[in-house]
Amino acid sequence: MMTPTIPVSPLDRLLVEGIGPHELVRRKLMCLFNSCASAGGETLPPLLTRGMPEWHGLNVGDKRVLNWFCRELRAAILRYEPRINVLRVSVKDAYHQPLALYLEAILQDEPEPLRLDITYYNGRWR
């Protein structure tokens, strides 16, 4: 006969494993970066519009286009991760084959910012 057990939430399981808030948010953001935004996202509920804005085909030589992409990216991240209070997104390198981004996020109740250098390489964000 099996003894009843109390189910453990995934968040509690992660906390037991010693994974801190920065690592949790970093993992969540990497999942977001490697998903695509749905077409017509403005007319869909927020849960269905998550995903990265597409950057292929953009004129990366135009600073206005890169600024637009950073704003879209920032909006997608803030919709996806409520623990981020302040977020700065900038293009680190757009003039070579892989697109490189820099993100700096201030998390709720965390004194140190989360800093990420993310590069698009071989079809994935790393």
Swiss-Prot record:
The keyword Flavoprotein does not apply. It is found in: Cytoplasm. One of its GO terms (molecular function) is anti-sigma factor antagonist activity. GO terms for cellular component: cytoplasm. One of its GO terms (biological process) is cellular response to oxidative stress. InterPro entries: Anti-adapt_IraD, IraD/Gp25-like. Keywords: Cytoplasm, Stress response. It comes from the Bacteria. Inhibits RpoS proteolysis by regulating RssB activity, thereby increasing the stability of the sigma stress factor RpoS during oxidative stress. Its effect on RpoS stability is due to its interaction with RssB, which probably blocks the interaction of RssB with RpoS, and the consequent delivery of the RssB-RpoS complex to the ClpXP protein degradation pathway. Interacts with RssB. Belongs to the GpW/Gp25 family. IraD subfamily. HAMAP family: IraD. This is Anti-adapter protein IraD. It comes from Salmonella arizonae (strain ATCC BAA-731 / CDC346-86 / RSK2980).
